[in-house]
Swiss-Prot record:
Keyword Mitochondrion assigned: yes
Pfam family of the protein (one): Omp85
Record remark: domains: Its C-terminal part seems to contain many membrane-spanning sided beta-sheets, that have the potential to adopt a transmembrane beta-barrel type structure.
Cross-referenced PROSITE patterns: POTRA
Disulfide bonds: none
Domain POTRA: 44-124
GO biological process terms on file: cristae formation; mitochondrial respiratory chain complex assembly; protein insertion into mitochondrial outer membrane
Protein name, per record: Sorting and assembly machinery component 50 homolog A
Oligomer and partners: Associates with the mitochondrial contact site and cristae organizing system (MICOS) complex (also known as MINOS or MitOS complex).
Gene designation: samm50-a
Role: May play a role in the maintenance of the structure of mitochondrial cristae.
One GO cellular component, as annotated: mitochondrial outer membrane
Length: 468
C-alpha cells in the first residue's frame, strides 16, 4: 500500500479519530515537524492539487478521480480522501505507483489554513508483458500476455493473451475503454479463437468469434450487455464417439445478444463469511443472424452466514432453462451440464443426465442446490498464519439435469425436474488460494444414482473459482 505523507503538521494524538480496523493502520503515515500549529481539529482548505510524473496520461482523466479531495474540511478528511483518490488512480491501471504528499501552502496567495496535495505517480511502460498460471473449473492453464496500457491517455488498453491449458487452448485480442470519471462504465471489444476438448462427450470444439460488451452499474447492481458472433466447429474427440456426437459434428454460426445482472454483497469472492450473491443471465440467439436460435436463462444464488466458533453456513442454488426457437433442436454446445467436484460432488465431471453410448449430451433444464458448513481446522494449527487458509468442509448437494417437452405445461416441467434427483454428501478440506481460486479435497458419498451416471465414490479433488 502507498503512504500519505503530511509535512509541517504536528503528529495526531494517540486518542485521535479512528482510521478503521487495525489492518488498515499502515495505510497512513505521518511525518511531522516540530513546533508547528496543530491543524488536526481545525478547518483547512485544499488550495491546490499537483501531479508529478504525468506523461501521456490526460489531465481530465486524473481530475475526475481527485475531485473529492477539494471537498475535505479538516486534516483527517484530507488524508482519508487523498488515500481514496490514490486507490482510484491505481484502479485505472495506468500507474505503477502512486504516492501522496500533503504540505502547507506557500506563496503570496496562500491562506493560513491552506494545504497543497501532491500526487507523485509513476506511469506504466507503453508495452508490458506477463506470465502466470490460471485455475479454472477443474482445469489449469499457462497464460502469456502482452498489454499496451493507457493507449490513448485515458486508461484505454489493448491486450493480447495466449492460454494453454489441460483441456483448452485459446488466444485473443481485446480493447478496453472506460468512461472518464466513471470507471465502472466501460466498453470492450474482443477477437478470439478457442479450442476445447470435452472428453465426457467425446467432443472437440473450436470457436472463432468476436464480441462487444458494455458494463455499467445501476444502484447496487452491475449489468453487462453483450453481442457475440461465433463460428463454431464441432468434431469427434475419439473414434469411439457415439453416433449422436457424430451427428452434432460440423459447423454452426451463432449470433446472440445477452444480458447479465450481478448483486454481490459478500465480504470475499472466495470462501466468504457473510453476504449474498445473485447472478441472472439471459441470452437470445438467432434474431441477429446465424443458424442457431434459442432463448437461454440461468441464475445463481448464494447466501452466507457466520456462526459461532468462526464457522460459516453457506447455501447455494443454481438453475437454468434453454428453449429452442423454431424447428431445429438445440446444439450440444449450448446445453447445460452438471456433475463433478465443482457442482454436484460425488459424480464425475459433467456426467449426469442424458447420454448416448457413454457420451454425455447435456440437458435443456437443470437445477442444483447445496448446503455447506465451513469450520476452522481442529485445534487451529497455524492460527493467524498459513493455517487460516484451510477450512474443514461438510456438504450436502443435490440436483437434476434433463430435457423438457415444451408442449407440456409448467407443472409437467417441475415434475420432471423433481424426478430422479441425484444427491451426495461428504466432508473434506478446502484451501483458499488468495482471492483467486480454491482447492477442495473431499470424501464423497453419491446417492440417487441413475442408470448411465458416472460416479466418483470416495476421494475427489476439485479446483476452480465457481463452486456450488
Amino acid at each position: 500500500m502507498g503512504t500519505v505523507h503530511a509535512r509541517s503538521l504536528d503528529p495526531l494524538p494517540m486518542n485521535g479519530p479512528d482510521f478503521g480496523s487495525p489492518d488498515d493502520a499502515d495505510l497512513v503515515e505521518v511525518e511531522p515537524q516540530k513546533k508547528q500549529e496543530i491543524l488536526e481539529n481545525k478547518d483547512v482548505v485544499v488550495q491546490r492539487v499537483h501531479f508529478e510524473g504525468l506523461g501521456r496520461t490526460k489531465d481530465d482523466l486524473v481530475a475526475h478521480e481527485i475531485g473529492q479531495v477539494f471537498k475535505a474540511k479538516n486534516l483527517i478528511e484530507v488524508m482519508r480522501k487523498s488515500h481514496e483518490a490514490r486507490e482510484k488512480l491505481l484502479r485505472l491501471g495506468v500507474f505503477r505507483n502512486v504516492e501522496v504528499l500533503i504540505d502547507t501552502c506557500e506563496g503570496e496567495d496562500a491562506v493560513p489554513n491552506g494545504l497543497d496535495v501532491t500526487f507523485e505517480v509513476t506511469e506504466l511502460r507503453r508495452v508490458t508483458g506477463s506470465y502466470n498460471t490460471m485455475v479454472g473449473n477443474n482445469e489449469g492453464s499457462m497464460v502469456l500476455g502482452l498489454k499496451l496500457p493507457n493507449l490513448f491517455g485515458r486508461a484505454e488498453k489493448m491486450t493480447f493473451q495466449f492460454s494453454y491449458g489441460t483441456k483448452e487452448t485459446s488466444y485473443g485480442l481485446s480493447f478496453f475503454k472506460p468512461q472518464v470519471g466513471n470507471f465502472e462504465r466501460n466498453f470492450s471489444v474482443n477477437l478470439y479463437k478457442v479450442t476445447g476438448q470435452f472428453p465426457w462427450s467425446s467432443l472437440r470444439e473450436t470457436d472463432r468469434g468476436v464480441s462487444a460488451e458494455i458494463n455499467f452499474p445501476i444502484w447496487k447492481t452491475s449489468h453487462t450487455l453483450k453481442w457475440e458472433g461465433v463460428w463454431r466447429e464441432l468434431g469427434c474427440l475419439a473414434r469411439t464417439a457415439s453416433f449422436t456426437i457424430r451427428e452434432e459434428s460440423g459447423h454452426t454460426l451463432k449470433s446472440s445478444l445477452s444480458h447479465s445482472m450481478v448483486i454481490d454483497s459478500r465480504n470475499a469472492s472466495i470462501l466468504p463469511k457473510s453476504g449474498a450473491l445473485l447472478k441472472i443471465n439471459q441470452e437470445l440467439a438467432g434474431y441477429t443472424g446465424g443458424d442457431v436460435s434459442f432463448l437461454k436463462e440461468d441464475f445463481e444464488l448464494q447466501l452466507n452466514r457466520q456462526l459461532t466458533w468462526d464457522s460459516v453456513l453457506s447455501t447455494s442454488l443454481w438453475g437454468g432453462m434453454l428453449v429452442p426457437i423454431g424447428d431445429r433442436p438445440s446444439s450440444i454446445a449450448d446445453r447445460f451440464y452438471l456433475g463433478g467436484p465443482t457442482s454436484v460432488r460425488g459424480f464425475s465431471m459433467y456426467s449426469i443426465g442424458p447420454q448416448s453410448e457413454g457420451d454425455y449430451l447435456g440437458g435443456e433444464a437443470y437445477w442444483a442446490g447445496g448446503v455447506h458448513l465451513y469450520t476452522p481446522l481442529p485445534f487451529r494449527p497455524g492460527r493467524g498464519g498459513f493455517g487460516d487458509l484451510f477450512r474443514t468442509h461438510f456438504f450436502l448437494n443435490a440436483g437434476n439435469l434433463c430435457n423438457l417437452n415444451y408442449g407440456e405445461g409448467p407443472g409437467a416441467h417441475l415434475r420432471r425436474l423433481a424426478e430422479c434427483i441425484r444427491w451426495s454428501y461428504g466432508a473434506g478440506l478446502v484451501l483458499r488460494l488468495g482471492n483467486i481460486a480454491r482447492l477442495e479435497l473431499n470424501y464423497c458419498i453419491p446417492m440417487g444414482v441413475q442408470s448411465g451416471d458416472r460416479i466418483c465414490d470416495g476421494v475427489q479433488f476439485g479446483a476452480g473459482i465457481r463452486f456450488l
